[in-house]
Amino acid sequence: MEEKSMFGPENREELTTKGYTVVRDVLSNEECDNCIQQYQRWLQEFPQDVFPPSMHSLISQFNTGHMEPTWFVRLKAKSVFAKLWQTSKLLTSIDAIAIGRPPEDGEESFAEPNKSWLHVDQNASRVGLHAVQGGVYLEEACEDDWTLEVLEGSHCYFEEFFEGRQDAARISELNIFYKLTEDDVKFYGGKGCQKIRVSVPKGGIVLWDSRLVHANARPRKDRKHPGLWRYVVFVSMTPAHWASETDMAKKRYAYNNVVMTSHWSSQGVKTHGSGLSISGLPTKIPEIATTNEAKELAGMVRYDFEDGKSNGPQKPTWKASKNAITFTRANVYTVCFVLCQVLIVIVAYLFNLF
């Protein structure tokens, strides 16, 4: 599925300086609408008045990463990552989607001043650029809609931040994410990193450096387009030659067992199951994901790294972790936070059922 990439020098420059960039026209409006219709049909599989458990619009259960429209978007986004990494020999994440209901309907809350879940997805032992994450927007998102919020330029201070905060570095080694405290946000503010809500056109993709502080932002009251839903497919691809045999085995497991992964697509691959089940849950790979191209991206078919074509940049570096997990007050807080989020999702689901 070869597509012309709109990723250009200006996008590369923005990724380097700002930590994020927006690429237009990854999908046509018609393709976006077709995908939205498929997700809407999937939502109808739930009992009446039940919405799948989500966190800030993210739906990471139910094998959403293996749904047909998700794979369609993933394959369409490949050309962007191929241009970014300067190689077509890539591995993909099998990541979450986001479906955000309009707060105007009373089922979701609006954005609140000075309240967010700003975080980084890269742990302190990774040195430099290890991944570029992406979100393909099937609906337009203006600054006041459901969208991505970033601390612009914060990726430049990633190592400095963790060097001075050993508890934070230890927490990041849990390899989930590190959620910033108010004092952490002030650190980045002191470096001139402004909080920006990113506008993304329909069919576009927003890319961000995994060291960038970011979060999904809720819609603001009195927004320009009240009633607008959010539909986003998250995609991350990195050079295939970065992967170890252990990582490749995990990718094959994810594909063969129809389970999802985190955004780490080559190094440090993490898999997770489908969670709560419903009728319509993907239990087999959709036909669109059985092509040779899709199997290469999933790690099922190996690339030829000796064919004389570019394999992309060299493997990124790691530093030995000095941050063995200990039960400090800070990381106990983070573990409790994650467990609470899981409990909230389960309770919300059971509440909707009954």
Task: Give the positions of each predicted feature.
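Non-heme Fe(II)-dependent double-stranded beta-helix
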Residues: 1-18, 24-125
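Extracellular structured ligand-interaction cores
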Residues: 20, 94, 129-135, 145-147, ...
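Short edge-strand/loop segments of extracellular domains
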Residues: 99-102, 151-159, 232, 236-242
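Short, structured patches in soluble enzyme cores that scaffold and shape functional sites
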Residues: 101, 120-122, 136-140, 150-152
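Short, conserved beta-strand element in jelly-roll/cupin
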Residues: 123-143, 199-202, 236-239
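Double-stranded beta-helix
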Residues: 131, 141-213
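Non-heme Fe(II)/2-oxoglutarate
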Residues: 166, 202-207, 211-328, 332-335
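Terminal signal-anchor or tail-anchor transmembrane helices
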Residues: 329-354
